[in-house]
């Protein structure tokens, strides 16, 4: 069962690739007193994720600051090197924080894992969460093959 609005974010670690190293980020510490939007994609470099989902957040990045969002992050069950390379290709770096949930620990804690079959294996469902000071204030988990309520446009509308 997925974590719902009003629940505290799980205390798990994610990873990000900097120029020189891979850094571990504790989600709760990283969230701190900020309002964050983080969205999961099933896989870096996959069709909908690359052509629509991540580019929507890049394109509308400035609109999130106007809604009092401090950070927008993209997470996938990939490694930090892949996430950085994908962020570079899509033009997300410097706007969207690219985070790796390499072993699906956060996805499991949030209750959003799904088996995508022999090619991708266990991944996270396409979804989006908004957290304020570590507490979930909005969430949307997509049905397989859909991109509706977790899109940048839908999340901006939910933040009205």
Each model region followed by its residue ranges:
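Chalcogenol-based redox active-site neighborhoods
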Residues: 1-160
């Amino acid at each position: 069962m997925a974590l719902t609005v009003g629940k505290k974010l799980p205390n798990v670690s994610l990873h990000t690739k900097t120029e020189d190293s891979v850094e571990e980020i504790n989600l709760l510490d990283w969230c701190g007193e900020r309002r964050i939007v983080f969205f999961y994609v099933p896989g870096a470099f996959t069709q909908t994720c690359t052509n629509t989902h991540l580019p929507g957040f890049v394109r509308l990045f400035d609109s999130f600051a106007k809604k009092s969002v401090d950070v927008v992050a993209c997470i996938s069950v990939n490694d930090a090197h892949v996430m950085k390379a994908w962020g570079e290709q899509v033009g997300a770096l410097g706007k969207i924080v690219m985070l790796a949930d390499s072993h699906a620990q956060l996805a499991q804690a949030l209750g959003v894992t799904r088996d995508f079959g022999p090619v991708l294996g266990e991944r996270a469902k396409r979804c989006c969460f908004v957290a304020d000071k570590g507490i979930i204030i909005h969430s949307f988990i997509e049905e397989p093959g859909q991109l509706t309520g977790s899109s940048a446009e839908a999340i901006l509308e939910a933040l009205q």
